[in-house]
Amino acid sequence: TKDKFVDVAGACAAESSTGTWTKVYDGKGSGVPMADKMKAVAFDLEPETNTFKIAYKVDLFELDNMSGLLAGVVGNIGGMKMLKAFRCLDIRFPRKMVQAFPGPQFGIDGIREQMGIERGPLLLTVPKPKVGRTAQEQADLARILFTAANGEYQGIKDDENLTSLPFNKFEDRCKAVLEVQKEIEEKSGKKKFYLCNVTHSNMETMLDRAGMIKAYGGRWMMMDVVATGFSAVHTMRLKNPGLAIHAHRAMHALMTRESGPGVYDKGVIFDFSMSMVAVAKIMRLLGVDSFHGGAPKAKMEDYGEAKLIRDVLELDITPETS
């Protein structure tokens, strides 16, 4: 019913800001007066599409703390019994919060300047099978790709689960491919790039791997940003030795997939999720330079979001999703 929908919207606003499930003491020292000032407000309620928006006071959050913000705005909502399903379609960040995050070190303009390519696509291949080649075989393939199309092909990329394996150690692969990159660049006079996967659950290991890439002459690193986590992305942006960051979204579907028919349509959803639009925006704020955002009509479900994701990654001011 409409009344129940209104109750749910209000409960989501309360739970994601200063509300709680029980009556609390409101006397001296209780914090209730400030909590009342900081409470969120649900607005633009649309029962026909089961959508609503929530507005938060900026002072409710630490400006440069993405993990803290997400613990608030989407932290507990999905677990509420009164909700049958929920999807966070978008998060609109205020200017002062956007400016508090590092953002991409290079971005589109910086990457084009780095590569000496003002217009047109940057072309690279992700070798298949995902794993199976040795480090030397990976380097041999890189040579083929770096010289393809009369030298107009730019790069090669590790896949998400190619890390440091018994038959393909990270340092061996990094060194071998980047030696080929250097050789081809010197011969052709054209810049190439290798997206070398530093993914690890230990931050120190990822930073060490980034250091190896820099030492061997690389310009890029790749990391599985969902699997490693928001704090890992933020830290790698701040502490990596001047490398551009490519973000692979492996594991995202456990956050973003929705099996209902109503995403961006009739509001009928079955699951609890966050859109890839929101995830992409978060990753851009945290500092990735390029993002594996998916493509329309490809093997991964995109719910028609591909253009929205592109806008989030390219535009200075992103359009509001409906």
Predicted regions and their residues:
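Well-ordered, non-membrane alpha-helical segments in soluble/globular domains
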Residues: 5-10, 66-69, 138-142, 170-178, ...
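Acidic (Asp/Glu)-rich catalytic clusters
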Residues: 112-117, 146-150, 171-189, 211-215, ...
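Catalytic alpha/beta core domains of metabolic enzymes, predominantly
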Residues: 207-210, 216-322
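Glycine-rich, proline-tolerant flexible connector loops at the mouths of alpha/beta enzymes
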Residues: 153-175, 295-300
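Active-site mouth loops of central-metabolism enzymes
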Residues: 1-3, 119-140, 193-205, 253-275, ...
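A cross-domain feature marking catalytic cores of carbohydrate-active enzymes
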Residues: 127-129, 160, 196-200, 223-225, ...
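N-terminal capping/small domains of soluble enzymes
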Residues: 1-152
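N-terminal active-site wall of soluble small-molecule enzyme domains
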Residues: 173, 177, 185-194, 198-214, ...
